[in-house]
Amino acid sequence: MKTIETEIIINANVETVWRVLTDFHNHPNWNPFIKSITGEKTVGQKITVSIKPPDGNGMTFNPNILKFDQNKEFRWLGKLGFKGIFDGEHYFILEKVNDKQTKFIHGEKFSGILAMISGKMLYKTKDGFELMNQAIKKECEK
């Protein structure tokens, strides 16, 4: 299993960060990595996510929501083909630093046969996470 994890401190309360993160309709206006998310925000439901890593090929996939805990955590599991080929558990965790700051943790756990040989793609993915982190910080601090 390979894991990418990034974090950033956002000068906004947890509620503001959650609102921006889960306003799927507005993602195309600020998010340079996740170009769109559509679907019902309910655990167990499939959503449609389109991403575009920097200098990488864009892709659209249909992960299942694993967690959607208001003001705390949003997590999904996506699979390439069948389970065990290339699976990604993507997560966003919000931790209250104080009333005016939030730690935004953004990561993904990759598993499956192809996860072991996908090094270059994972670096581009991490770059995409960091770009998104900067963008959500800017959007929340407006």
Predicted regions and their residues:
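Hydrophobic ligand-binding cavity/cleft-lining segments
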Residues: 1-38, 42
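Short beta-strand micro-motifs in enzyme catalytic cores
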Residues: 2, 45-47, 90, 102
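Hydrophobic pocket/interface hotspot
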Residues: 17-21, 27, 47-49, 65, ...
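Hydrophobic-ligand binding "helix-grip"
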Residues: 38, 55-101, 109-111, 138-139
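Glycine-centered small-residue hotspots that permit tight backbone geometry or close packing
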Residues: 42-46, 69
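Short aromatic-glycine motifs in intrinsically disordered, low-complexity regions
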Residues: 50-54
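A conserved amphipathic terminal alpha-helix motif
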Residues: 103-142
